[in-house]
Amino acid sequence: MKVAVLGAGAWGTALAGHLAARHDTLLWARDAALIAGLQARHENSRYLDGIALPDALRYDAELGAALAHGAADDALCVIAAPVAGLRTLCRAMRDAGCVPAHIVWVCKGFEADTHLLPHQVIAAELPEQLSNGVLSGPSFAREVGQGLPVALTVASVSAACRDRTLAAFHHGAMRIYTGDDVIGVEVGGAVKNVLAIATGIADGLGLGLNARAALITRGLAEMSRLGAALGGRTETFTGLTGLGDLILTATGDLSRNRTVGLQLAAGRSLNDILGALGHVAEGVRCAQAVLALARAQSIEMPITEAVCGVLFDGVAPRDAVSGLLRRDARAE
């Protein structure tokens, strides 16, 4: 199978390395210098340093070439750009006049200005593209790059997209499950990043494992309420792309969103934290969108509200936690 991966960040690079072990894979990035480095060293020293990439993996900075590769009859196109760049990439694909027949995206979050999920952005920009879906689940790019075991879910209303994605990714140490709840999978992948910031704050303040467990559990309830209101199925949120991804992102030391929370608890400013990370922390980008959607649906999301207070309103982390503890008692 031919596979084009659009986006050479940590996640796109790790997935491309996995795919290249079995398929004719081309990794694209618009940054010519990044591509030149990949071609010379077979390592993404900027985003996934220390991980050797397969010799068979090819690289290109020309979008047209990547799209042509991913538009072959037996091909798959993987969109690994962040949500913030998704609409621009879709427009570039449309302008290039070469939209692949089968597309799967791996980005997580809501578009900041519109509060749209990735599938809604793609439907608006590429309305003729009908075989598409989302690949998500509890996964750190570095571990995938190291070939460690991982389980992911592809969700699509298109059986052709599910089958093509399964055939591409399900090999080696990667196990793929299939489903059709695109909204539920996307909401889980977006909201868990915000909740991971909350658990990072609690851990950074030394509040203990009891507090962490409470935040994860009540955070899952927030995720489920919002996801169901937006059209997702409740059972999706107890699976890999909901609870599974939440546990990993809230507790794993490789989690950028958890790191943001830890550093906020240590008194660092958000700007300094993001500057030092050098990578996207989607929980920061989509926290306000999550809260706005919750309010539009009249859904209570106190943990998300507390995170937004710390990120954007100058609320001290300890005061935000105190506010959660002062909430009225209620039935679970």
From Swiss-Prot:
Binding-site residues for NADPH, renumbered to this chain: W11, R30, K108, A141, R256, V280, E282
Annotated GO MF terms: glycerol-3-phosphate dehydrogenase [NAD(P)+] activity; NAD binding
Enzyme active site: K192 (proton acceptor)
Claim: Chloroplast is one of the keywords in the record: no
Biological processes, Gene Ontology terms: carbohydrate metabolic process; glycerol-3-phosphate biosynthetic process; glycerol-3-phosphate catabolic process; glycerophospholipid metabolic process; phospholipid biosynthetic process
EC annotation from Swiss-Prot or TrEMBL: 1.1.1.94
The keyword Oxidoreductase belongs to this UniProt entry's keyword annotation: yes
Residues bound to sn-glycerol 3-phosphate: K108, G137, S139, K192, D245, S255, R256, N257
Coiled-coil residue windows: none
Gene Ontology cellular component annotations, sorted alphabetically: cytosol
Subcellular location(s) of the protein: Cytoplasm
Reactions it catalyzes: sn-glycerol 3-phosphate + NAD(+) = dihydroxyacetone phosphate + NADH + H(+); sn-glycerol 3-phosphate + NADP(+) = dihydroxyacetone phosphate + NADPH + H(+)
Pathway assignment: Membrane lipid metabolism; glycerophospholipid metabolism
Keyword vocabulary terms for this entry: Cytoplasm, Lipid biosynthesis, Lipid metabolism, NAD, NADP, Nucleotide-binding, Oxidoreductase, Phospholipid biosynthesis, Phospholipid metabolism
Residues that span the membrane, as ranges: none
NCBIfam families: PRK00094.1-2, PRK00094.1-4
Family: Belongs to the NAD-dependent glycerol-3-phosphate dehydrogenase family.
Chain's role: Catalyzes the reduction of the glycolytic intermediate dihydroxyacetone phosphate (DHAP) to sn-glycerol 3-phosphate (G3P), the key precursor for phospholipid synthesis.
The protein, known as: Glycerol-3-phosphate dehydrogenase [NAD(P)+]
Taxonomic lineage: Bacteria, Pseudomonadati, Pseudomonadota, Betaproteobacteria, Burkholderiales
